[in-house]
Amino acid sequence: MNTRQLLSVGIDIGTTTTQVIFSRLELVNRAAVSQVPRYEFIKRDISWQSPVFFTPVDKQGGLKEVELKALILAQYQAAGIAPESVDSGAIIITGESAKTRNARPAVMALSQSLGDFVVASAGPHLESVIAGHGAGAQSLSEQRMCRVLNIDIGGGTSNYALFDAGKVSGTACLNVGGRLLETDAQGRVVYAHQPGQMIIDEVFGSGTDARALAAAQLGQVARRMADLIVEVITGALSPLAQSLMQTGLLPADITPEVITLSGGVGECYRNQPADPFCFSDIGPLLATALHEHPRLREMNVQFPAQTVRATVIGAGAHTLSLSGSTIWLEDVQLPLRNLPVAIPQDDADLVNAWRQALLQLDLDPQTDAYVLALPATLPVRYAALLTVINALTAFVARYPNPHPLLVVAEQDFGKALGMLLRPQLPQLPLAVIDEVVVRAGDYIDIGTPLFGGSVVPVTVKSLAFPS
């Protein structure tokens, strides 16, 4: 059996907390000798987990780069792992941390110092999907062929991911979390973030001083927060819930058969702390309010496989060498790294399907760099090629982008597609790479051409989640 073993690392930098997870991954090529390689994870063993520590931020809300790097390197040392011995990895930055002024450069610098890692600055849609995968909601939905809604409730946001038979059918993000009100050990509010103050104003009246609230009154705030979280599930949103939405709503009239709660508040929902202010916020109070919420008690709430550690545990990577006779490559400057792949869910309307796939990745079709994947079910016929050409030209016309048009296909028709597409888009840098199998959430690197341009190395990187 053709297998590969990797030592990988997953680093999750969130609004409130950061964690590091080392894992040993084993990938197997499931394809026959004559077929396109198709790698799958067969073992995902977590070998070491760091404590969950607070994300270091300064008074202006920026990441403290030096302190963050020192914290992460300390986890390598504690695990007894040298950075150079790690084969692959993923750094995910989420929540309010992703919005800080120095988030992207800080994480890219960290990645370059540690190795060639997948780097994802996750907005609300991608964060929801990552949490749903990490919690095990996606695999539960796939195994049971049912609809599972995971709600990842962290410090600043609640991220919703709806899976239908394993596929993402909706995401949403509500600006409600357990650390919107920071407290001291006695439950006195020391700081109210703006969304938290908005909730206080609705419950107690505009202009209420959060620092004057008693512990019992914080319970009222937590109950209103629980109401808001449930409103997003039911689709009946109050004006306050509407104002706190960071995204669109979940699909209407679709009832999840199972609900799972992950994140720090999800962990408190599972294991309620004796001290409600042990984390110096109202996360435990919010978990209690969710436990007692009458509408939520009517729903099928189950504990997920992971709660506070619902995140990536690393990234699997495998490299393919592709024959230049089957690809089209013109005016594209290589190498290109960490390109997210947009995989369409609807073969009938590729333009809209690509747009939806990019939305799930929190990517802007007109500014970000990405790869458009063709449907794996597409037949190798001339009529199918014409359909793809029409879709690609329509997509480029609707979403002009300064980056090259990059297309990846499982089928063996890259050269033909490129030759037919080039007259339609004569000025656009273009790459069509075929015989590559990709899945939702994958990233690819396209290396510098080898052997006089006859071979292009392509590395497919898949995020790894707890099994």
UniProtKB/Swiss-Prot annotation:
Pfam families, A to Z: EutA
UniProt note: phenotype after gene disruption: Can use ethanolamine (EA) as a nitrogen source when AdoCbl but not cyano-B12 or hydroxy-B12 is provided; cannot use EA as a carbon source. Required for aerobic growth on ethanolamine supplemented with cobalamin (vitamin B12). A non-polar deletion mutant does not grow on EA between pH 5.5 and pH 8.5.
GO BP, sorted A to Z: ethanolamine catabolic process; generation of precursor metabolites and energy
InterPro entries: ATPase_NBD, EutA, FtsA/MreB
Protein family according to the UniProt entry: Belongs to the EutA family.
GO cellular component: bacterial microcompartment
Organism, as annotated: Salmonella typhimurium (strain LT2 / SGSC1412 / ATCC 700720)
Protein name stated in the entry: Ethanolamine ammonia-lyase reactivase EutA
This protein's UniProt keywords: Bacterial microcompartment, Chaperone, Virulence
